[in-house]
């Protein structure tokens, strides 16, 4: 409780905790306004405040690109300012090992540097590593003294640093330095440790021993996400372990590894966190889960009584575009504007009411594949971090987007004055204009026949998706864009009666990275009996499939005709393959 009246100020912390006092002072700092004479003034105010969630976190991937100790400390300052209290430090991944481990110096010696200036060049250029003194070497790592300094710096600001050491997947860099930890068999090494070798557990526990000496955190994050079983199927050691343990599927090997590491951490007075893939196995009640794949995984974790950190990609992945993609630096994809982050409500009806205390909190994530510089990292984080902080701290009934947006505009200026490189919120473009309103055209609400089926992976609105009057936004994952594989799309709309038509149009998307391409050609046809169709126009795509920028292209016909049925055919480019995505078949 903070009370400011005339010349008096009183701070009362019911929990009498140092963190409570610290957060009260953060409120004072945010309330203070420079008077113009070198002093600051506070308004008369009474504030009674407490956080909604006890875990309020932010994640930073330093493997894809390395950032200095000073940069990390600068971000910790911002977390403290906005009352976040966990820093999830993603220290290892296939793109580089970033923490000194004295028992295994080859980890940093051989894989902390790459002969490429950025991740994208490395990914497309052979994914090799080099030593620090090699020509063109790029990268770095944190010494154990660096780690101790950062951990202490965070502690002084009431932030717990949680290290992540990836296993069993995302470990290409380890296998490059220590190939004896890879699977046997005919396949070349992938990104997964061999869970069938006892040497793997010796390595992992030795690494974790040093990590635990550096990080006093209650929890250690072990990754656990996106493991492939391809190598395990062909590995003699993995198959021998499966036989000895009575396993039926290779996925059980991951559960076995996770269980052994969980037990090791518990024996050493620590607890385990993993990404939500660890839910496939039995977990100790002390373990926690970072949920990134959506509400159903969060509900499963909560129902099982596990501490649950909610961090869904749709709301909490700050590596997504935050504005119209063509106005922004290259990103991994997606579209996550400030308003959507702010709209996130972690607790849903899918969570059992008697287990809501298992919702530990929320976390934002910054994966840095396409974020090569410190300035770019800050650009992606701020001001979205402000929205995350309010989601984590403020009760739902107290949230107000208009109030928050006005405050965020001012806070961006403060951050800029403090040396942070923020997104230009004042000049935000926003979502795709046609996605902001309903298009009341002649085919809206009419029945659609799919001559070629849409993909079950991207159904959007199902059989009404292309005639519901709703256009898609900037990303194909917004559940407005319908996806097609195979030969492409071929749909017929029944207008219910013959009527005059002056225009037919349909949009398609191209985004080369995830394999989304414009059609090779689009044809518009009409019919009055639903059997014989007359071709109105065929349009051939001219944009090359090598173009990597997001493109949304409209294909249309204009003229004068009468028709009962309208049809559009869009053929997949055989040279490109991949998906077609479209959002609305407009008839006027």
Give the positions of each predicted feature.
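Extracellular/lumenal ectodomain signal focusing on beta-strand-rich modules
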Residues: 44, 57, 106, 361, ...
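Single conserved hydrophobic/aromatic residue that forms the stacking wall/gate
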Residues: 1-7, 11
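Extended acidic/polar, glycine-enriched regions
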Residues: 12-50, 67, 86
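Acidic, glycine-anchored loop motifs typical of Ca2+
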Residues: 440, 456-475
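Substrate-binding groove of N-acetylhexosamine-processing glycoside hydrolases
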Residues: 149, 158, 169, 201-219, ...
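Short proline/glycine- and polar residue-rich coil/turn motifs
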Residues: 542-549
């Amino acid at each position: 409780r903070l009370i400011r009246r005339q010349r008096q100020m009183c701070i009362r912390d019911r929990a009498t905790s140092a963190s409570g006092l610290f957060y009260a002072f953060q409120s004072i700092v945010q309330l203070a306004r420079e008077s113009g004479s070198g002093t600051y003034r506070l308004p008369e105010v009474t504030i009674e405040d407490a956080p909604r969630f006890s875990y309020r976190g932010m994640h930073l991937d330093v493997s894809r690109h390395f950032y200095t100790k000073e940069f990390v400390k600068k971000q910790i300052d911002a977390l403290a300012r906005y009352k976040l209290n966990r820093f999830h430090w993603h220290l290892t991944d296939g793109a580089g090992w970033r923490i000194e481990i004295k028992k295994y110096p080859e980890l940093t010696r051989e894989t902390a540097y790459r002969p490429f200036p950025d991740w994208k060049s490395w990914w497309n250029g052979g994914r090799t590593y080099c030593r620090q003194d090699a020509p063109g070497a790029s990268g770095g790592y944190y010494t154990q003294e660096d780690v101790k300094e950062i951990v202490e710096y965070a502690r002084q600001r009431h932030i717990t640093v949680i290290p992540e050491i990836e296993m069993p997947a995302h470990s290409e860099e380890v296998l490059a330095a220590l190939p004896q930890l890879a699977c046997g068999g005919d396949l070349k090494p992938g990104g997964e440790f061999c869970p069938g070798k006892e040497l793997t557990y010796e390595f992992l526990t030795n690494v974790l021993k040093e990590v635990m000496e550096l990080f006093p955190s209650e929890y250690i994050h072990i990754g656990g996400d996106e493991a492939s079983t391809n190598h395990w199927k062909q590995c003699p050691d993995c198959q021998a372990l499966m036989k000895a343990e009575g396993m039926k599927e290779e996925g059980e090997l991951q559960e076995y590894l996770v269980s052994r590491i969980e037990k090791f951490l518990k024996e050493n007075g620590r607890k385990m966190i993993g990404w939500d893939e660890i839910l496939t196995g039995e977990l100790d009640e002390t373990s926690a889960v970072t949920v990134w794949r959506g509400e159903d995984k969060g509900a499963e974790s909560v129902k099982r009584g596990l501490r649950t950190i909610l961090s869904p990609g749709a709301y909490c992945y700050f590596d997504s575009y935050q504005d119209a993609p063509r106005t922004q630096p290259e990103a991994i994809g997606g579209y996550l504007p400030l308003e959507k982050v702010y709209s996130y409500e972690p607790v849903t009806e899918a969570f059992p009411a008697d287990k809501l205390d298992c919702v530990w909190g929320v976390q934002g994530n910054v994966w840095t594949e396409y974020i090569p510089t410190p300035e770019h990292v800050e650009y992606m984080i701020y001001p979205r971090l402000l929205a995350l902080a309010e989601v984590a701290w403020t009760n739902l009934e107290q949230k107000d987007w208009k109030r928050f947006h006005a405050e965020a505009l001012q806070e961006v200026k403060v951050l800029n004055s403090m040396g942070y490189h923020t997104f230009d919120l004042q000049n935000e473009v926003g979502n795709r204009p046609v996605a902001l309103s309903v298009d009341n055209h002649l085919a809206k609400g009419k029945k659609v026949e799919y001559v070629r089926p849409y993909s079950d992976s991207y159904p959007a609105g199902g059989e009404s998706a292309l005639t519901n009057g709703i256009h898609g936004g900037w990303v194909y994952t917004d559940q407005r864009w319908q996806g097609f594989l195979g030969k492409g799309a071929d749909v017929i709309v029944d207008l219910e009666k013959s009527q005059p038509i002056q225009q037919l149009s349909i949009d398609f998307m191209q985004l080369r990275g995830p394999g989304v391409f414009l059609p090779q050609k689009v044809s518009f046809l009409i019919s009055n009996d639903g059997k014989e169709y007359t071709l109105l126009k065929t349009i051939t795509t001219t944009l090359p499939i090598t173009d990597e920028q997001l493109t949304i292209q409209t294909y249309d016909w204009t003229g004068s005709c009468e028709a009962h049925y309208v049809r559009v055919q869009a053929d997949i480019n055989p040279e490109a393959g991949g998906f077609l995505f479209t959002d609305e078949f407009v008839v006027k």
